[in-house]
A protein has these predicted regions:
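A short, N-terminal "cap"/entry segment at the start of jelly-roll beta-barrel domains
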Residues: 1-33, 113-131
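Tight coil/turn sites that cap or link beta-strands
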Residues: 41-43, 78, 86, 96
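Short beta-strand His + acidic residue motifs that chelate non-heme Fe in jelly-roll/DSBH
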Residues: 48, 66-67, 83, 89-95, ...
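Glycine- and acidic-residue-biased ligand/ion/polar-headgroup-sensing regions
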Residues: 54-55, 59-64
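Short acidic-glycine-tyrosine-enriched beta hairpin
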Residues: 70-86
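A short hydrophobic beta-strand segment most commonly corresponding to one strand
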Residues: 82, 96-114
Length: 131
C-alpha cells in the first residue's frame, strides 16, 4: 500500500494564473484515474476543450462557471458536474478569490484537444509503463 501525501506534490504552472497539483496519475502509480487540483486566479480557469474519457469537475472553494456543450452552470463548493466523454467543457473563476477545482478523469494521463493549438494537450505521461 502506498500512502500519498498530497500537499507534498509540487504545484505546476498550467497556464498564466492557473496552478495545478497532481493527486493521482500514471506517474504516481494510477492505472485508470487522473485526479488533480487546480487553483485559478479571478476570471481564469480552463478554456473549452475535449477529453476522450469522462471527467468530474468538483468545486472545492470559490464559485465557477462551468460550460458543457452550449450550456453553462454556476457551481459552488461541494457541487460537481459530470462531463461525458468527448463533450466540450471548460470553466472560469467568478469570484475575486482563488477558485479551487478538483478534476477526475477516467484515464491515468491527461489528454485534451483544445481550440487553441498552443495549449499543451498531454501531461503526466511516464516515459515507460511498468505493466
Amino acid at each position: 500500500m502506498n500512502v500519498l501525501i498530497h500537499h507534498d506534490q509540487p504545484l505546476e504552472k498550467w497556464r498564466e494564473g492557473v496552478m495545478t497539483r497532481m493527486r493521482m496519475s500514471a506517474l504516481l502509480g494510477g492505472r485508470q484515474l487522473c485526479i488533480f487540483d487546480q487553483f485559478c486566479d479571478p476570471g481564469l480557469g480552463a478554456p473549452l476543450h475535449i477529453h476522450a474519457v469522462e471527467e468530474v469537475l468538483e468545486v472545492i472553494e470559490g464559485t465557477a462557471e462551468i460550460w458543457l456543450g452550449k450550456k453553462s452552470a454556476i457551481v459552488k463548493p461541494n457541487q460537481s458536474v459530470l462531463v461525458p466523454a468527448c463533450a466540450k467543457d471548460g470553466f472560469r473563476n467568478l469570484e475575486n478569490t482563488t477558485l479551487h477545482v478538483r478534476a477526475t478523469l477516467a484515464a491515468p494521463i491527461f489528454e485534451a484537444s483544445y481550440n487553441d493549438t498552443a495549449e499543451t494537450s498531454r501531461r503526466w505521461t511516464p516515459n515507460h509503463f511498468d505493466l
